[in-house]
Swiss-Prot record:
The NR LBD domain, residue ranges: 211-439
Alphabetical list of SUPFAM superfamilies matching this protein: Glucocorticoid receptor-like (DNA-binding domain), Nuclear receptor ligand-binding domain
Pfam families, sorted: Hormone_recep, zf-C4
Name of this protein: Peroxisome proliferator-activated receptor delta
Oligomer and partners: Heterodimer with the retinoid X receptor. Interacts (via domain NR LBD) with CRY1 and CRY2 in a ligand-dependent manner.
Any GO BP annotation: generation of precursor metabolites and energy
């Protein structure tokens, strides 16, 4: 068999530039940043003439450190890894080499020297390079965990809980590094973690107990500085109580959308997707993620607000007039069941990432690419749950069902928002939320 000494430069360059070209070739989204709806219909919550749209937020401050860079070495040659490819972290060159070898069924002249594969010499011995790819576990089937043989699956899961001194498993190490990266991004971008919220709700936190809001009087005490630093911008101090609470919810939602956008930009490969696809994933995913995270600050009696400074009772929210009283109750019901799964923040980080990178969202341009990213996240989530909850045998399928439950919850919520927009003529929706709800379901 012929033993090629060098990869063709033009082929190699094509492979290495492939993903970059895809990102740079992303089309404008319906006219670019001007796509955000005008704020003239919403003066209570935003005095800005042009509040940031989802596209604007995606394009803000995105650099290599904040946009999903793992800063990991390629397992094959030691070059900088561009992502998780065929089951291991690999650079663009080794990813392309492995793909070409498999697709074209190339056979290389056998080498007995066990050549050391490094960035500077990786093209010298293709046989040893391919053998190293195989030894590290690179495989077309590695994209989807479900296609792996059961024996291999059990071996990988066992590796998660193995002692530090045990035999090194590159696939497990890559998934651990991936999970850690997602968890660190979660801690960096979200002000309220579940750990912090539960310590406040159970009275174990060191700071002052939250101020309890249970009626109109305590709400206005909270607004005067006990909980919130300032009133909602432009909101008259004695506007109808139900509308005021609705506006407060919108303020919190908009801030959480901003946090989720930054978190999404930290997920490996998210920022290399078409901008149109990034916007679509956020449009359909943020509310599912918000309602999943809402469970962290909820117990059966109420929920934390203002970063834990206040606690609004469930009964007070039920006392609001319809349709506003109907908004939060289904979220309480979901939260109580979701909290029974006893997830921690490291579990939630991967779960939220899997929600955002969902390949069946309407209007996606590159479905296979999104599905491949989500497959990696789900694989990492399943491994992580096996290690973090060894006695919870069915936790992973239960979480997949919760993803379906969240989709139904958001569908009903979006429909409710559209009804409020039509029937409550004195009530406005924030422009960013209008953009999200428009033509949603």
């Amino acid at each position: 068999m012929e033993q090629p000494q060098e990869e063709a430069p033009e082929v190699r360059e094509e492979e290495e530039k492939e993903e970059v070209a895809e990102a740079e070739g992303a089309p404008e989204l319906n006219g670019g940043p001007q796509h955000a709806l005008p704020s003239s219909s919403y003066t209570d919550l935003s005095r800005s003439s042009s509040p940031p749209s989802l596209l604007d937020q995606l394009q803000m401050g995105c650099d290599g450190a904040s946009c999903g860079s793992l800063n990991m070495e390629c397992r094959v040659c030691g070059d900088k890894a561009s992502g998780f490819h065929y089951g291991v972290h690999a650079c663009e060159g080794c990813k392309g080499f492995f793909r070409r070898t498999i697709r074209m069924k190339l056979e290389y002249e056998k080498c007995e020297r066990s050549c050391k594969i490094q960035k500077k010499n990786r093209n010298k011995c293709q046989y040893c390079r391919f053998q190293k790819c195989l030894a590290l576990g690179m495989s077309h089937n590695a994209i989807r965990f479900g296609r792996m043989p059961e024996a291999e699956k059990r071996k990988l899961v066992a590796g998660l809980t193995a002692n530090e001194g045990s035999q090194y498993n590159p696939q497990v190490a890559d998934l651990k590094a991936f999970s850690k990266h997602i968890y660190n991004a979660y801690l960096k971008n979200f002000n309220m973690t579940k750990k912090k919220a539960r310590s406040i709700l159970t009275g174990k936190a060191s700071h002052t107990a939250p101020f309890v809001i249970h009626d109109i009087e305590t709400l206005w005490q909270a607004e005067k500085g006990l909980v919130w630093k300032q009133l909602v911008n432009g909101l008259p101090p004695y506007k109808e109580i139900s509308v005021h609470v609705f506006y407060r919810c919108q303020c919190t939602t908009v801030e959480t959308v901003r946090e989720l956008t930054e978190f999404a930009k930290s997920i490996p490969s998210f920022s290399s997707l078409f901008l149109n696809d990034q916007v679509t994933l956020l449009k359909y995913g943020v509310h599912e993620a918000i309602f999943a995270m809402l469970a962290s600050i909820v117990n059966k009696d109420g929920l934390l607000v203002a970063n834990g400074s206040g606690f609004v009772t469930r009964e007070f929210l039920r006392s609001l007039r319809k349709p506003f009283s109907d908004i939060i109750e289904p979220k309480f019901e979901f939260a109580v069941k979701f909290n029974a799964l006893e997830l921690d923040d490291s579990d939630l980080a991967l779960f939220i990432a899997a929600i955002i990178l969902c390949g069946d969202r309407p209007g996606l341009m590159n479905v296979p690419r999104v599905e491949a990213i989500q497959d990696t996240i789900l694989r990492a989530l399943e491994f992580h749950l096996q290690a973090n909850h060894p006695d919870a045998q069915y936790l992973f399928p239960k979480l997949l069902q919760k993803m379906a439950d969240l989709r139904q919850l958001v569908t009903e919520h979006a429909q409710m928002m559209q009804r409020i927009k039509k029937t409550e003529t004195e009530t406005s929706l924030h422009p960013l939320l209008q953009e999200i709800y428009k033509d949603m379901y």
